[in-house]
A protein has these predicted regions:
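C-terminal helicase module of SF1/SF2 nucleic-acid helicases/translocases
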Residues: 20, 62-80, 84, 88-275
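Post-DEXD/H (motif II) to motif III coupling segment of the RecA-like Helicase ATP-binding lobe
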Residues: 1-78
Length: 275
């Protein structure tokens, strides 16, 4: 959702209390909490019987992909395979079917008619086929405890929040889950993409959403606190310097200036009475 959509509720009623729930707050939203403009509560305790997802950054390796898919199917599980290009997802599906001929594969993306797409999703939830090859439409809202392996193709093209959400499609039971971030050689991707891949691979423990959001804030910047931009760049001064300047400005507005004003008023009143 954009800033205008999220803030629209405030136009309906003044001084309304708003509770925002998110796995990975965007930089602008997180910055509000860090500068004490909003209260922040963190849920660090995962649901019972969950285990951390084993994450790995890999090159596009046919043997590794085939072996990982076979392992998951042999233990009775299912697989998500994210390929975020509708224009060639059908061709990609043909390659995948040739790689694992015995697997049942179906494709899902936003251009499929609604009822047909819903039918595919329900069939996957009901364990009627093995691999769901899809775009990022599976990013949120799907709870398939039997799906415990996910491949994310060209992971370097996604934001940290997207990667975290997609990884969260697996590991929703007490089984070991696996997430494979498929990227080109790291030498061929941008510096920010390297930082995102390193961060998502580092923070794989349960309850890491806040750490990932902090890293996202550091990489992308806080955005426009008073305007509509949800992320921005603070490379010119550095993240720590930006945080310090912002905190000092907020504290000055909240405390220092007001205290000084009230103190001056008291002095003026006492002086007037003595006179």
């Amino acid at each position: 959702f954009g800033v205008n959509v999220k803030e629209k509720i405030r136009s309906l009623k003044e001084n309304i209390d708003v509770l925002t729930l998110t796995a990975t707050p965007i930089p602008r939203t997180l910055q509000y909490s860090l500068m004490s403009a909003r209260d922040l509560s963190i849920i660090n305790t995962p649901p019972s019987n969950r285990v951390p997802i084993q994450s790995e950054v890999i090159r596009f390796d046919n043997n590794l992909i085939r072996d990982s898919i076979r392992f998951e199917i042999e233990r009775g599980g299912q697989i998500f395979f994210v390929h975020n290009r509708i224009d060639n997802i059908s061709e990609f599906g043909i390659w995948l079917q040739e790689l694992v001929p015995n697997a049942k594969i179906k494709i899902a993306h936003s251009k499929i008619e609604g009822k047909k797409l819903e039918k595919i999703m329900l069939e996957f939830i009901n364990n009627e086929f093995d691999i769901l090859l899809s775009t990022t439409i599976i990013e949120s809202g799907l709870d398939v405890p039997n799906a415990n392996t996910i491949f994310i193709n060209n992971a370097q093209n996604f934001g940290l929040s997207d990667l975290h959400q997609m990884r969260g499609r697996v590991g929703r039971s007490n089984k070991n889950a696996f997430c494979y971030f498929i990227t080109p050689p790291l030498s061929s991707i941008t510096d920010d993409a390297k930082k995102r891949i390193a961060a998502i691979n580092q923070y794989s423990e349960l309850g890491s959403g806040f750490n990932i959001s902090m890293k996202d804030l550091e990489i992308r910047g806080a955005g426009d606190i008073l305007g509509g931009e949800q992320s921005g760049f603070i490379n010119d001064i550095g993240f720590e310097t930006y945080q310090k300047i912002l905190s000092e400005a907020v504290n000055e507005l909240k405390n220092s200036e007001f205290k000084r004003l009230f103190k001056d008023d008291q002095i003026d009143e006492s002086t007037t009475e003595e006179t």
